[in-house]
Amino acid sequence: MRLWPALFAALAAAPAQAVELQFCWRGAAGYSMTGLMRFPDALRDAALVTQDDITAFEITGWRHGERLGHWSLEALGPDTSWLLSFDPIAMRFPMTGIGVFQAWNAGGAVDDCGAPGFGFNAGNGGQDVCVDGRFVTESTIPWETPLYAGTTPVTPACDGAPMLSGTHPLRTPPAPT
């Protein structure tokens, strides 16, 4: 029966499975953002995934295909604006409510992403980006614009990204049990 402790040790050492998704946001005036996030597989069918559940996250800002900046969860500090909600069933970031819905290194004033820096914000005023500590007003699109995530790689042009559709074509069904 010495096999059981070895089996438990091996299972404990095995990495937990994670859901990895990519997303692409297309703002106004040639601005876009690509991103990647991971969260535990056990939350694949949860009602909501929040910033507290995310195990890896990174975003890169672009304008007309030129890189503007980058932010990742590894740079999270006590003063970083960090608010995220994601619906893993619909594979979309909810953009409803009052106030700020998403704050990825950019709070409500969209000017706290650092210099150099990049951040994204979505709230009642719209969806927009922060570049080098500056609110880029010309990037703003309507707050209710859907933002989806999927398993397909994305490009700064958001080509093929499931962004503005009523259904999400890239939802990966759970593996058969």
What spans do the regions from the language model cover?
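Absolute protein N-terminus
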Residues: 1, 18-19
